[in-house]
Amino acid sequence: MSSHLNWMIIRNNNAFLVKKRNIKKPFSKEPNNVTNLNSYRYNGLIQKKAVGVVENPDRKGFTVVYKKAKATNKPAKNAVRRQFKAGARRSLYKVKRLLKANHYRTDLSKATLRRASAILRSQRPIKAKKPKAAVAKTE
């Protein structure tokens, strides 16, 4: 089946949709959707080439999951997982090179880099805040 026909089938009704009141466009929780928007362009289920970013279980780095266009009819061989733990700048540079080498769309690669950097930012240790001078004097 074509991706357009698949989209027409799953567009308004699938297990990954998140519909809420006062939100015009529903969100999506599907695995390879980097923007979490329910749209044909970013849908990870129907596109031949899709990319997703997930956090590593040990909270050190992230994993990029991408689909190979050649193995569309073989779901077991379709997904490729690559872990990145080298450090923030180096990992993001490697992801950028990976997506460029596999000829992914630029909007997908930008969204992927944004998601990966958000994951790395969430893994940073939280700095202890110093007490303010006024509060310290009164105690």
Curated annotation (Swiss-Prot):
Origin: domain of life: Eukaryota
Key word Ribonucleoprotein present: yes
Family indicated by similarity: Belongs to the eukaryotic ribosomal protein eL28 family.
Database matches in InterPro entries: Ribosomal_eL28, Ribosomal_eL28/Mak16
Record-given protein name: Large ribosomal subunit protein eL28
Gene Ontology MF terms: structural constituent of ribosome
GO biological process, one term: translation
Species the sequence originates in: Spodoptera frugiperda (Fall armyworm)
Pfam families assigned: Ribosomal_L28e
GO cellular component: ribonucleoprotein complex; ribosome
Keywords: Ribonucleoprotein, Ribosomal protein
